[in-house]
Amino acid sequence: MATKRSLIYNELSSELYKKFFLTHDEKQAAKDGYIYIHDRSARLDTVNCCLFDVGSVMKNGFEMGNIWYNEPNYLDTAFDVMGDIILSTAAQQYGGFTVPEVDKILEPYAEKSYKKYYEEYMNIADDIDYECKPEIHSEEADKYATDKVHRDFEQGWQGIEMKLNSVGSSRGDYPFVTMTTGLATSKFGKMASITLLNVHSEGQGKKGFKRPVLFPKIVFLYDKELHGDGSDKYPLADVFNAGIDCSAKTMYPDWLSLTGDGYVAEMYKKYKRIVSPMGCRAFLSPWYEKGGMYPESQDDKPVFVGRFNLGRL
């Protein structure tokens, strides 16, 4: 039913757009094939692609629909809330929906979960064994808490994959969701990237018939100084190698070089700002904090996260 409605609505929207938004010359040019209007059926006062600032939305809580969401206290809840945000907001636009640097977004919630699990183990251990040395308890608690957080990451990514590939939007399709990752250097930031890649590699489905899912599309943010060739001398070698292993088994991740040549690398080298792709191929031009389209001074930095575009010819 959603697909049928979408086909009818898209045809109506396309005709309304031609009637009320295009000049006679533009309509003739489109008819003759000189121009092509991308996504004409969905361009009536809607957002095309965006770099959604999920981290800022979750911080301190937010209101969505008729419900107030408190900021997640732990990692498992953060995954649930992030999934709700993506499904709700991506359905209100028609282009690519990107969650930039998702590893850094989930990092603080993983830290909170680790502390919870660590204290949980220590409380139980103290009640059971009074004579054991505190440092032994501490080592065991660290392993217990780390393993629990790792499992939370695995289950969280599995849940995200299930949501994004099973819950269709009112447009009659599944939102084109992209996540960029690979630059977080902390213990749990790296764990976020590695588990995302490993879960995608394993795929979803019945045992023996699993296959990689379409969404989220994964884009690996490659920094030569951090990832290098994957040897141990680089701080993010394990993340890089997880990406290589995932690429060998699936179509993802896409690789975006931040230290090579071109516009994206230029923004990163000069400002340390990431230009994540919106969906699959669209990159925003810079908008500066003080100067707008052009930098006001040498200290003026571009903003990318939290912005969107309105379509193109």
Positions of predicted regions on the chain:
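Conserved catalytic cores of very large enzyme subunits
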Residues: 2-313
